[in-house]
Amino acid sequence: MILCVNRRVLHTVTIDTPAGEFTMLGDNSRLYGAGFTGDLARVMASIRALPDDVGWEIRPGANQLLEQAVDAVKQYFEGNFEPVASFPIWQQGTPFRHQVWSTLRQTKAGQRLSYSQLADASGFPGATRAAATTCAVNSVGLFIPCHRVIRADGSIGKFGWNQQVKVDLIEHEARLARRP
């Protein structure tokens, strides 16, 4: 007897950006992973789970969705932040985490907020540590802009992909968000 296992294909692409290499992973409908690294294994490690219990096959090279994602990232670095903010993504999480990620996607480029402000804006006052953990497990960097979250004392804080990348993204957004 031959067993046929349903397999889904995930495509992956790495591009050069002003903030360094950026790798994305997605199927035909949404992104599952994205981060400032050329190391696909690192992006894969950031993904907590994939939907469904089917097999996944990783294929290098962009499909139509990743071509659109590449365009969205290029537009981001040209100062058009909307395509990244509204791009289709998926990541597993609790209702709390999904609310925090949704709040982050609604923040404006150039806006910075503390972890406690993020928790408050998400409807969970006092859940500062949980909001910080939610940022730490974000598997779709840039598309969920955790880089906009700073410490209450105004310092930059940590960033899973590289602290200098966080600084560069904050400065990029501050500079371009002020444009007329």
Spans of model-derived segments:
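Regulatory, non-catalytic segments
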Residues: R129-G141
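Short Lys/Arg-enriched helix C-cap and helix-to-coil transition segments
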Residues: L142-V149
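…primarily DNA-binding HTH/wHTH and HhH modules…
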Residues: A152-P180
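Short glycine/proline- and charge-enriched loop/turn segments
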Residues: L50-D53, I150, Q163
